Design a protein with these regions (language model features):
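Feature responds to low-complexity, polar/acidic, surface-exposed segments characteristic
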Residues: 2-46, 54, 59-107, 114-135, ...
Length: 164
C-alpha cells in the first residue's frame, strides 16, 4: 500500500514536469503551497503540488517562490526522488565535472546515483541544471520502483516536444 501511495505521489509530481515546482532551496521550506506568492490555488496543478509540498517533496526556489511556469531540472527531480524514497547512502560522483560540491543539489545527485536512479549524460557530465525530459523523469521513476519497463508496451511519443 505504501509503495502505491509513493508511486501516486511521484506520478502526480512528474505530471507537473512542465512546471518548475522546484525541489531546491535546501534552507527554506514552505509549510504549505499557498505560502508561495506565485502558487495559483485554482490552477490545474494545485492539488498535486499542494500534496507534494505538504509531504515534503517540494520546497520551492525560495520560501516565497515555487516558479510553477519554469522547467524542472535533473537535480530537482533527483531531490524529489530522494525525498520520496528516503535515500541516505551517497555515491562518489567526483567524475562528474559539472556537479560542484558547493551546489545545493550535490548530495541529492550523489544519493540518486547510488540508488541507481540516475546516470550521467556522459562519463564526466551529469547536467544537473538542464531541464529534465519526460522520458528521463519516467525512467528515473521506473528505476526507483524497480519496474521492468522493457515489458511494458511502447507508446508513440512523437506529439511531445520534449521527447528524447
Amino acid at each position: 500500500m505504501k509503495k502505491k501511495r509513493i508511486l501516486a505521489m511521484i506520478l502526480a509530481v512528474a505530471s507537473c514536469l512542465s512546471l518548475a515546482v522546484s525541489a531546491s532551496a535546501a534552507n527554506t521550506v514552505a509549510r504549505k503551497a499557498t505560502d508561495f506568492r506565485d502558487f495559483d490555488k485554482s490552477a490545474w496543478y494545485a492539488e498535486a503540488v499542494s500534496a507534494a509540498v505538504d509531504n515534503g517533496l517540494l520546497y520551492g526556489k525560495s520560501s516565497t517562490i515555487i516558479d510553477p511556469n519554469g522547467d524542472m531540472t535533473r537535480a530537482e527531480m533527483a531531490a524529489i526522488i530522494n525525498r520520496s524514497f528516503g535515500c541516505y547512502k551517497a555515491a562518489d560522483i567526483s567524475q562528474y565535472k559539472d556537479v560542484s560540491k558547493s551546489k545545493w543539489y550535490y548530495n541529492d545527485v550523489a544519493l540518486a546515483v547510488q540508488m541507481g536512479t540516475y546516470n550521467g549524460r556522459s562519463s564526466s557530465a551529469m547536467a544537473p541544471d538542464s531541464p529534465i525530459t519526460r522520458q528521463e523523469a519516467m525512467t528515473v521513476v521506473a528505476r526507483a520502483l524497480e519496474l521492468d519497463y522493457d515489458s511494458y508496451s511502447k507508446t508513440d511519443l512523437s506529439a511531445f516536444s520534449d521527447r528524447s
